[in-house]
UniProtKB/Swiss-Prot annotation:
PANTHER family, alphabetized: BETA-FRUCTOFURANOSIDASE, INSOLUBLE ISOENZYME CWINV1-RELATED (PTHR31953)
InterPro entries, A to Z: Beta-fructofuranosidase_N, ConA-like_dom_sf, Fructan_Metab_Enzymes, Glyco_hydro_32, Glyco_hydro_32_AS, Glyco_hydro_32_C, Glyco_hydro_32_N, Glyco_hydro_beta-prop_sf
Enzyme class: transferase
Keywords, alphabetical: Glycoprotein, Glycosidase, Glycosyltransferase, Hydrolase, Transferase, Vacuole
Gene Ontology CC, one term: vacuole
Gene behind the chain: 1-SST
Gene Ontology biological process terms from the UniProt entry: carbohydrate metabolic process
Description of how the protein assembles with itself and partners: Monomer.
Protein name, as recorded: Sucrose:sucrose 1-fructosyltransferase
Glycosylation sites noted in the Swiss-Prot or TrEMBL record: N32, N328, N457, N491, N506, N625
EC number(s) reported in the record: 2.4.1.99
Pfam families the UniProt entry points to: Glyco_hydro_32C (PF08244), Glyco_hydro_32N (PF00251), INV_N (PF11837)
Catalytic activity of the protein: 2 sucrose = 1(F)-beta-D-fructosylsucrose + D-glucose
Lineage: Eukaryota, Viridiplantae, Streptophyta, Embryophyta, Tracheophyta
Proregion positions: 1-106
Amino acid sequence: MESSAVVPGTTAPLLPYAYAPLPSSADDARENQSSGGVRWRVCAAVLAASALAVLIVVGLLAGGRVDRGPAGGDVASAAVPAVPMEIPRSRGKDFGVSEKASGAYSADGGFPWSNAMLQWQRTGFHFQPEKHYMNDPNGPVYYGGWYHLFYQYNPKGDSWGNIAWAHAVSKDMVNWRHLPLAMVPDQWYDSNGVLTGSITVLPDGQVILLYTGNTDTLAQVQCLATPADPSDPLLREWIKHPANPILYPPPGIGLKDFRDPLTAWFDHSDNTWRTVIGSKDDDGHAGIILSYKTKDFVNYELMPGNMHRGPDGTGMYECIDLYPVGGNSSEMLGGDDSPDVLFVLKESSDDERHDYYALGRFDAAANIWTPIDQELDLGIGLRYDWGKYYASKSFYDQKKNRRIVWAYIGETDSEQADITKGWANLMTIPRTVELDKKTRTNLIQWPVEELDTLRRNSTDLSGITVDAGSVIRLPLHQGAQIDIEASFQLNSSDVDALTEADVSYNCSTSGAAVRGALGPFGLLVLANGRTEQTAVYFYVSKGVDGALQTHFCHDESRSTQAKDVVNRMIGSIVPVLDGETFSVRVLVDHSIVQSFAMGGRITATSRAYPTEAIYAAAGVYLFNNATGATVTAERLVVYEMASADNHIFTNDDL
């Protein structure tokens, strides 16, 4: 039965929940993990309507402090006491996987999170299991009339370990039904984890699941599984092949550097199926991609050379993806040499924990992928997302003829907080991905159209003008579970009047408090005034050649007052073509802020763990921190978002 509660010391209701309340202490959490469930409805708490007011923004963004009382009451009551924190134990390369701990740490002990605070952090419309730890998306596929999502999951705890493949299905990639675990680490060749892999559906309907097994000695091998009943549209049971493991690391490859087989494709040059596996070359510490061919998915031949070797210093390539974009490209790879078709090669950087991609040409017969721009080679140039986004996996959706990409969003708080709240990590919103037809130098990513079905009440505030050095609070009913569409226009006379070049700005070092003639300007979300806020913004400057350059950034530096949280400033330069306004779509879902700027040419994902800007105190502001320009929000529409309907699968769902 759905329950509700009241924030201690206030009259503001908690969001309704359909799972057990959080434990009162970290010790209780370890003994009896809370189930963490899903939120069923959007928050009913209403922000007090406020008149638009112009305020000086410099102090707000630069970190000016004010005496503060509790936001909406004493939300910190019933807090989990701060206790001495141990330095986080690494869960990464020793296990042959990328680092799985955030590293968040405070020598003074963890922040005393209250249950109400932690309850608020759980998202409403992002995918996550009921409880415990999850990471990489695995084997996304459309099969039997269902979208299937498998993912790395620890069924026994809230940090990395005991990794199995969990499984959920959906009709729309928004509302999900949780199924029993698909595979668990029960064989010597995967006893330390059923790691990342992929699913391939053959033309005759056979379903092939390839995955990396982490053996009893922490060596990485490739394994095969098939459905116990291919006629089951839910693919509920899987059989591991008796020939497992089907692939071992070849000579010269480290035992822990051989993982994540890609969805296979059929190559007509020799009538074989191909897959690739990520690895690294210790000579130069460069990422490499190994290619294999097979006719039966049991016996494989290693193809000579590397499909690609990255620049020195790129390190281990994880979670490789390869697919065509542009022209008449579809789900199948065949080395199409049409000039309109480019091939996206993507890797997840084991060293940096970012997802890089590059555009290039692919000669399947020669087993060579070549970037179209060596300066933007794989691992040193373009990223899928400039924030907390990792281990992405795409699939071709035959139902709607589109490519969809998933990734997971890690935590940036402490492991102690994750244990207390009973869960860690979640999935991004699934995104469509395609070539930017205007630039042909980057991809366009956008939330799947099905997400719009969760939009409810809308507030249209288009036409607001924000003077230089000003901030305006938006009169919204709530600011914790929303979808914002905005486009901004700088006053043309202000742009024309600018004569000095500004080439020093950098998202990761400058932030939203650094003022220039034409920025920063944008939105403050999960904001309560002068104490907590996450900035989503543009910064426009003129180069030495007089051309305008635009940065799109997130500034997390003031997103929380908790000290045991990793906060960053993220973003990069984004192309803005003649006649285009500065546009952005921002999805705010409690502790997640995801942005898609310039139609999806650049994306950024932030984790935010506010201590005060929660529930009714979570506001949204327009800001303009430029010194010499007026900004107009030509379009500004804010949608309240309902929560997704996620629950354990029952026969009523058929």
